[in-house]
């Protein structure tokens, strides 16, 4: 098994390099977004939503690139039920996430019409929203603002398919860790314009 794995890795590393040093790519992407609580920074949880972003890549070598990313996402409104002393009540929550990040990526498979990459970015992100919480029968409900800014660390992997000399389509998965808030997972489709 180790021998087969070694042969596969050797083949991948020996694949001809088709991305050119100095080449740039501009991409727009969007897709499904879900949130994961890391600690317990707020009451309740958020429903899945959608995210949208722009990314620029500049190839430093034939495989390694520098990337800059602008991103925005939302839960598209969350409602949930809670059993309380006054009966079943509906609580609501809402959030919008924004971030800017930069980092390095690597095309580990690079063919003429296909490439697969991994990337890691760091930056700053902010959350703007609120959560609702039932306190007691006498107090009732409380709306807690969720406005936080924190460092951001992202890791992602994706695939790109060249459909012409200047255009690529593809998909990607990204995990974003927003330090003092939570994490999010995104599966997106994207389209890229290649500048030679």
Which residues does each PLM region occupy?
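Sec-dependent N-terminal signal peptides
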Residues: 4-13
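Flexible, solvent-exposed loop segments that connect beta-strands
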Residues: 35-45, 71-98, 126-151
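Repeated loop/turn-to-beta-strand initiation elements of outer-membrane beta-barrel proteins
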Residues: 62-66, 112-114, 161-169
């Amino acid at each position: 098994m180790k021998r087969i794995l070694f042969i596969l890795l050797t083949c991948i590393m020996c694949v001809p390099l088709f991305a050119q040093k100095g080449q740039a790519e501009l991409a727009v992407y969007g897709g499904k977004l879900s949130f994961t609580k890391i600690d317990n920074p707020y009451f309740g949880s958020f429903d899945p939503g959608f995210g949208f972003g722009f990314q620029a890549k500049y190839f430093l070598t034939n495989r390694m690139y520098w990337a800059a990313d602008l991103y925005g996402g939302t839960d598209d409104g969350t409602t949930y039920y809670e059993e309380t002393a006054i009966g079943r009540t509906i609580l609501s929550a809402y959030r919008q996430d924004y971030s800017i990040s930069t980092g390095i990526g690597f095309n580990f498979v690079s063919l003429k019409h296909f490439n697969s990459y991994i990337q890691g970015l760091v930056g700053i992100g902010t959350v703007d929203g609120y959560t609702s919480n039932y306190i007691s029968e006498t107090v009732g409900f409380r709306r807690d603002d969720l406005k936080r800014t924190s460092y951001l660390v992202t890791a992602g992997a994706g695939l790109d398919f060249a459909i012409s000399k200047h255009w690529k389509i593809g998909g990607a998965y990204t995990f974003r860790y927003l330090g003092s808030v939570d994490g999010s997972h995104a599966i997106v489709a994207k389209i890229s314009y290649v500048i030679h």
